[in-house]
UniProtKB/Swiss-Prot annotation:
GO terms for molecular function: DNA binding; RNA polymerase binding. The keyword Transcription applies. Residues 1-32 form a coiled coil. This is Transcription elongation factor GreA. Necessary for efficient RNA polymerase transcription elongation past template-encoded arresting sites. The arresting sites in DNA have the property of trapping a certain fraction of elongating RNA polymerases that pass through, resulting in locked ternary complexes. Cleavage of the nascent transcript by cleavage factors such as GreA or GreB allows the resumption of elongation from the new 3'terminus. GreA releases sequences of 2 to 3 nucleotides.
Amino acid sequence: MKKVRLTREGYEKLKKELEDLKRKFMYEISERIKEARELGDLSENSEYEAAKNEQGRVGSRIMEIEQILSNAEIIEDSEESDEVTLGKWVVIKNLDTGEEHKFRIVTPQEADFFAQKLSSDSPLGKSLLGRKVGDVVKVKAPSGVQRYQVMAVMNK
């Protein structure tokens, strides 16, 4: 499998999720399965079926995270510069509306719009990578082409 690029923050978040899932997998779900078995006939036991399904889902996620972490390449904060790279925060201005937005450019695995984390694989993320303060980018959106100017780039 090829390397998966993650910020330090994204790597630590996945490690914590893995620990939490393993704890849940080992104790909570196992206990639910045990309790459901004690109810008798497993062929019509919805609690047992639900617990087994949850066990499968959690087990799959554990394997997925372990795969990601074992192939992770951590992106450390780089030197201060005005170039947009992975892990950097960027302030952009929509030249059509005047609205400003602040995002951190992250890998697709870490993207979270509500936490201001923009995927480097998104149309806007792709167009911003490698740009510098003052550069203008054009992005195709459902509402038409949007123009953004890079106003600031920072590590934090």
